[in-house]
């Protein structure tokens, strides 16, 4: 492992594999920007072999928000560098760099004018910068190098595959558990509860390469169909035999023990049974309990009384014990009876229900993953995790080296941000691209901080980071904290800088960092505040409600002082008053957030929970809105009364009673809801809800309440969602039914609750969400909460150092390793929490720490409490804090008896700025648009319409699609059944073309006649079962028709990895589409007598979708399927007829456009691509004419190099 050295951004080598460890607040983003500038300019020492442009520098991070932020920061650095270099070029005075040490050092060996030119180009092209999320990068590579990845161009990215998982979890439950006998089904229902419960247990680890650690490997290897009868059924059978044996033997057992209890022993002999435990009266109760258990088919657990008192080993343990009084007596002779030995043998032969339940869960997991995999093999939906898996697999297969080389060629340099959040699959991808085949002209930098690896629950793997760290050629670290005031930095150094592994693992080191000396300080009522303030409760227990109250009152005092201009941040040059938005309260989850928010609300302090993941459908407003919609849909007494009884209308019981009693009042309400119904029907639901909002004064009413902003935000959000959903539902009733299902949680769409306000509010945020952020003042009210016992988890997963694998410890044999992982992450979470503040942190702690392990307790004791969940004794909190205070001198305040008292409710005034809409003064070009071949061809025909003779009118508006006109005469199914052999008489029209295209898209070409898929095709064509054989024969003929005598290949010969189906494209028109130049080019170089195109000049893009692109013998071919009906005989599909149809429908224009699009695509992804050498040609397959004979129904052309080259200039 390379030694870690301080980073110098000027000298860091850029042509190797390096790792940068960036502790919290040490300027990681600034460092990335500095290295980016060096790469753009080929500047500094140990620089890259050539200057790179923004498209060649790959920067990968893990969230969309981080990606946008990083792009913004890099753009700002480039702009700043342009301004400073420009100023320096004019003055040659280094003061132009304004104390920018990096640029000052960088300019020493820089051609300033060339550098400014390159930076301006980079600034202009930042929208093209290769700054992506990990999933965005994977998707781009899969699509761009589709022939190497085998990915379908029409893949549908699904952010949330919950609906699929629910579907497959239910399927598995039905398929395997419904047929079980009563006892086995009872076991499943009790242990696994429901498919939803199983998903909640498995979801976090689905898709991981998870090995199971268990002694009985066979229980894992058998399929579920064998596991259930052999193991679950076998358990129930053996258990029933045990119960039956007990019932048969109960009287005998009772007699044996009774005889022993009344047996006389010599006075100098200890008894074989302890008669204080075993008594005749107790014996009867014990046996009755076990009898009841034996007669209860629902109870599958081993009875504890049976285990404790009637097994041979437990009886031997329960002999009379030697004491001081009877120490002279002879030892007891162990009591033995074959019946107890037999009972023990039977019990020990049983697998524990806990293990059996986990094994069943393992098989459920395997079945669920297989269902998901099978589904995705046959469908285009792909999740984010699938993108990673597919790229990783593509890089490992036979063409993986070539794919890695192409990616390396495209991105010779890569930086991976937040690398501590990586996993083994992500590292395998970048390892394959950059580490396995290092080249002189490539560089790879991993940037992260193992101390901030807190996303294990999302699949992040700290051990992958540590492995990558060991494999890096060089390791660097950032050594100065720019975020926090000096004394806060000193405090973190004091807490974590101790020898006993502050982060549990030896290879996660803590290095004390330096800090700035020019930071502001926090002053309260004229006095400088300590960096750390601890409030100790009088209770020894963690009382979260009390701690939340202390936190809220402390914040109230801060804000009161701020209102009096007595809470300020200042130094000699700068002064600013504390605002509510400067304060953050860090919590672990929404429950803690609710406690704090509630206490703040009591004191009149508005706050916002920034980590709210709840659905808006779970809000009270959603339920009340459902009542309102019911009344609008059904204008009747009961629905209207239910609606106006909601909080939205603000009526009380007396008001509603008055409405019921007063006919005029009631009629007004009935008329209102009738009007709302009409608005819904005529203008839509959004218009209706806005009408209700205005007429009923709902906004004013809600905003007058404490939770008003939250409720109004939810109302408006739901109105938007309902408006969007209305487009998908045919009636108001259907929309209301959908809305009620969303509230109930059925197949719920993603609708995360929105922030209620962006005003100056106290922020409440989870520690996980706060990572990477900073706040002026930070409150940590719940850090003393004891750690949860990791062994209590149902699924225990840990990393095995010996096996270098993630293991499911199904038998709980390695709880020490599990505890280490859990505690290590708790410490990393603590580190993140303690490094968010800029000026002060405040804590609420109990008088004593609990006897359970706690991360803050661990660092305050400098690791002395060890790594066991249960501690020997509790520790006095004040004593621990005093040790910390001694190191920090005057920068720690310990309040042992918080004398905070709540003040009167605050009224915080916020300035409301007046806003005015800007006036648009620009000019929008109206001729930019996205068109298609179909639009171009139809426009051409419309132009010709006015010059053609009336006798040709019937053909003017032919759609020129891949199928016959919608107006073509349909052949009935009845006629088809009379003449099944003539496939040429298939129905005509759009439906047929669409169905055939879908069939070709979904099937392997070697399996076009697959019975299951043929049935789907037949049904979509509305043909009965008698047509199945004809369809199969026809599709067999299509797949085996040689496309060309020259290349000698049929569709059936194509490997799936050499095909891209339904390849969409956007062909950019570089300037304007020059119609005259297009016609001139065709006349000069096109061998078909194509007519002149009549079309307007436009700019923009031409879009389309190529049915098939395939690769054969190193050449690329374009294929289009046509289901056009040309006649009832095969002679109607000969080469002359096909050529005539190609010209009549202008398909030659289509394939020239498609060829140009494919040509440009291949230029961008195939190294050293050459059209003359690499492009094979175009096949148009007229499916009705393909009968297995060479080139039957197949039109082929290969546009000349000159034609495509000139067309490339036309578009």
Curated annotation (Swiss-Prot):
UniProt GO MF annotations: 3'-5' DNA helicase activity; ATP binding; ATP hydrolysis activity; DNA binding; exodeoxyribonuclease V activity; magnesium ion binding
Positions of the UniProt region annotated as DNA-binding and helicase activity, interacts with RecC = 1-877
Q: Where does Mg(2+) bind?
A: 997, 1107, 1120
Specify which residues bind ATP according to the UniProt entry for this protein.
Answer: 22-29
Biological process per Gene Ontology, one example term: recombinational repair
EC number(s) per entry: 3.1.11.5, 5.6.2.4
Q: Which UniProt keywords apply?
A: ATP-binding, DNA damage, DNA repair, DNA-binding, Exonuclease, Helicase, Hydrolase, Isomerase, Magnesium, Metal-binding, Nuclease, Nucleotide-binding
Q: Which residues form the UvrD-like helicase C-terminal domain?
A: 500-772
- Spell out the reaction equation it catalyses: Exonucleolytic cleavage (in the presence of ATP) in either 5'- to 3'- or 3'- to 5'-direction to yield 5'-phosphooligonucleotides; Couples ATP hydrolysis with the unwinding of duplex DNA by translocating in the 3'-5' direction; ATP + H2O = ADP + phosphate + H(+)
Question: What would be one Gene Ontology cellular-component term for the protein?
Answer: exodeoxyribonuclease V complex
**Which HAMAP family does this UniProt record tie to the protein?**
RecB
Question: Which family is this sequence assigned to?
Answer: Belongs to the helicase family. UvrD subfamily.
Q: Quaternary state and partners of this protein?
A: Heterotrimer of RecB, RecC and RecD. All subunits contribute to DNA-binding. Interacts with RecA.
Protein's recorded name: RecBCD enzyme subunit RecB
Taxonomic source organism: Haemophilus influenzae (strain ATCC 51907 / DSM 11121 / KW20 / Rd)
């Amino acid at each position: 492992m390379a030694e870690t050295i301080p980073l110098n951004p000027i000298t860091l080598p850029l042509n190797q594999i390096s790792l940068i460890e960036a502790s919290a607040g040490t300027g990681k983003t600034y460092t990335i920007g500095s290295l980016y500038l060096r790469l753009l300019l080929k500047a500094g020492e140990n620089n890259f072999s050539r200057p790179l442009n923004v498209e060649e520098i790959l920067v990968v991070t893990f969230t969309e928000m981080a990606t946008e932020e990083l792009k913004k920061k890099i753009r700002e650095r480039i702009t700043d560098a342009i301004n400073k270099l420009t100023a320096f070029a004019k003055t040659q005075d280094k003061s132009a760099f304004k104390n920018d040490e990096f640029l000052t050092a960088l300019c020493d060996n820089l051609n300033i004018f060339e550098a400014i030119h390159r930076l301006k180009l980079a600034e202009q092209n930042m929208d093209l910068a290769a700054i992506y999320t990990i999933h965005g990068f994977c998707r781009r590579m899969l699509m761009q190098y589709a022939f190497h990845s085998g990915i379908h161009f029409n893949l549908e990215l699904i952010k949330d595959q919950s609906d699929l998982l629910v579907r497959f979890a239910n399927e598995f439950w039905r398929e395997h558990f419904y047929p079980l006998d009563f006892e086995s089904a009872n076991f499943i229902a009790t242990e696994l509860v429901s498919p939803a419960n199983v998903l909640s247990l498995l979801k976090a680890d689905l898709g991981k390469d998870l090995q199971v650690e268990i002694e009985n490997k066979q229980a894992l290897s058998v399929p579920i169909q064998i596991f259930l009868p052999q193991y679950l059924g076998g358990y129930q059978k053996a258990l029933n035999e045990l119960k039956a044996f007990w019932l048969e033997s109960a009287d005998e057992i009772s007699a044996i023990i009774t005889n022993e209890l009344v047996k006389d022993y010599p006075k100098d002999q200890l008894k074989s049974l302890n008669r204080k435990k075993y008594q005749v009266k107790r014996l009867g109760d014990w046996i009755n309990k076990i009898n009841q258990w034996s007669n209860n088919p629902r109870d599958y657990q081993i009875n504890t009384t049976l285990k404790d008192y009637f097994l041979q080993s437990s009886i031997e343990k329960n002999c009379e014990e030697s004491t001081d009084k009877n120490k002279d007596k002879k030892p007891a002779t162990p009591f033995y009876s074959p019946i107890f030995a037999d009972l023990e043998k039977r019990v020990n032969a049983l697998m524990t229900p806990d293990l059996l339940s986990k094994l069943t869960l393992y098989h459920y997991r395997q079945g669920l993953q297989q269902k998901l995999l099978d589904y995705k093999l046959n469908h285009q939906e792909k999740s984010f995790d699938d993108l990673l898996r597919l790229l990783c697999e593509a890089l490992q297969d036979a063409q993986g080296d070539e794919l890695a080389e192409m990616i390396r060629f495209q991105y010779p340099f890569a930086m991976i941000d937040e690398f501590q959040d990586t996993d083994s699959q992500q590292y395998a991808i970048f390892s394959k691209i950059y580490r396995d085949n290092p080249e002189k002209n490539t560089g790879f930098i991993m940037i992260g901080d193992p101390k901030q690896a807190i996303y294990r629950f999302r699949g992040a793997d700290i051990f992958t980071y540590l492995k990558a760290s060991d494999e890096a050629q060089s390791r660097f670290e950032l050594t100065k904290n720019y975020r926090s005031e000096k004394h806060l930095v000193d405090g973190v150094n004091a807490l974590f800088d101790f020898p006993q592994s502050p982060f549990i693992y030896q290879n996660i080191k803590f290095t004390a960092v330096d800090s700035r000396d020019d930071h502001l300080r926090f002053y309260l009522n004229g006095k400088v505040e300590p960096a750390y303030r601890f409030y100790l409760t009088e209770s020894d227990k963690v009382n979260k409600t009390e701690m939340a109250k202390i936190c809220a009152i402390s914040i109230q005092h801060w804000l009161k002082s701020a209102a009096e201009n007595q809470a300020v941040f200042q130094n000699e040059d700068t002064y600013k008053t504390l605002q509510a938005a400067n304060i953050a309260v860090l919590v672990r989850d929404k429950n803690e957030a609710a406690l704090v928010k509630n206490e703040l609300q009591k004191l009149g302090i508005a706050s916002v929970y920034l980590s709210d993941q709840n659905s808006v459908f779970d809000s009270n407003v959603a339920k009340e809105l459902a009542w309102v919609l019911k009344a609008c849909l059904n204008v009747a007494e009961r629905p209207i009364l239910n609606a106006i009884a909601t909080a939205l209308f603000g009526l009380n019981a007396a008001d509603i009673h008055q409405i019921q009693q007063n006919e005029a009042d009631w009629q007004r309400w009935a008329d209102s809801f009738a009007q709302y119904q009409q608005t819904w029907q005529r203008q839509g639901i959004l218009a209706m809800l806005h009408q209700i909002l205005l007429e009923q004064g709902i906004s004013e009413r809600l905003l007058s309440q404490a939770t008003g902003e939250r409720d109004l935000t939810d109302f408006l959000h739901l109105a938007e969602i309902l408006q969007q959903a209305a487009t998908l539902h045919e009636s108001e009733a259907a929309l209301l039914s959908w809305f009620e299902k969303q509230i109930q949680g059925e197949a719920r769409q993603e609708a995360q609750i929105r922030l209620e306000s962006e005003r100056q509010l106290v922020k409440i945020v989870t520690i996980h969400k706060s990572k990477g952020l900073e706040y002026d003042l930070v409150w940590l009210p719940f850090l003393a909460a004891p750690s949860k016992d990791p062994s209590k988890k149902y699924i225990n997963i840990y990393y095995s150092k010996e096996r270098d694998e993630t293991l499911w410890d199904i038998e709980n044999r390695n709880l020490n390793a599990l505890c280490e992982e859990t505690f290590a992450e708790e410490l990393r979470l603590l580190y993140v929490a303690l490094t968010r503040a800029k000026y002060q942190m405040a804590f609420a702690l109990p008088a004593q720490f609990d006897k359970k392990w706690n991360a803050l307790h661990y660092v305050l004791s400098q690791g002395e409490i060890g790594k066991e969940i249960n501690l020997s004794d509790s520790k006095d909190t004040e004593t621990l804090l005093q040790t910390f205070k001694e190191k920090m001198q005057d920068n720690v305040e310990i309040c042992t008896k918080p004398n905070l008292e709540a003040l009167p409710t605050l009224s915080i005034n916020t300035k409301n700025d007046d806003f005015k809409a800007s006036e648009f003064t620009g000019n929008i070009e109206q001729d930019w648009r996205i068109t298609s071949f179909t639009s171009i061809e139809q426009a051409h025909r419309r132009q010709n319409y006015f010059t053609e003779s009336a006798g040709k009118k019937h053909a003017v508006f032919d759609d020129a699609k891949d199928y016959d006109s919608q107006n073509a005469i349909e052949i009935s199914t009845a006629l088809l059944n009379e003449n099944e052999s003539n496939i040429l008489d298939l129905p005509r029209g759009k439906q047929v073309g669409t169905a055939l295209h879908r069939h070709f898209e979904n099937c392997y070409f070697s399996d076009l006649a697959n019975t299951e898929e043929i049935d789907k095709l037949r049904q979509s064509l509305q043909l009965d079962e008698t047509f199945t054989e004809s369809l199969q024969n026809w599709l067999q003929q299509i797949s085996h028709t040689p496309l060309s005598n020259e290349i000698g290949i049929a569709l059936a010969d194509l490997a799936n990895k050499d095909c891209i189906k339904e390849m969409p494209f956007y062909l950019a028109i570089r300037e304007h589409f020059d119609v005259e130049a297009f016609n001139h080019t065709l006349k000069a170089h096109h061998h078909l007598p194509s007519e002149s195109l009549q079309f307007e000049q436009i700019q923009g893009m031409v879009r389309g979708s190529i049915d098939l692109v395939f690769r054969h013998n190193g050449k690329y071919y374009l294929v289009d399927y046509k289901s056009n009906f040309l006649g009832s005989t095969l002679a109607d599909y000969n080469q002359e007829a096909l050529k005539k149809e190609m010209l009549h429908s202008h398909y030659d224009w289509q394939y020239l456009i498609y060829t140009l699009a494919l040509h440009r695509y291949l230029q961008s992804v195939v190294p050293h691509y050459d059209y003359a050498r690499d492009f094979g040609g175009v096949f148009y397959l007229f499916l009705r004419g393909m009968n297995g004979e060479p080139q039957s129904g197949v039109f082929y052309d290969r546009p000349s190099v000159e034609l495509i080259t000139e067309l490339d200039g036309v578009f």
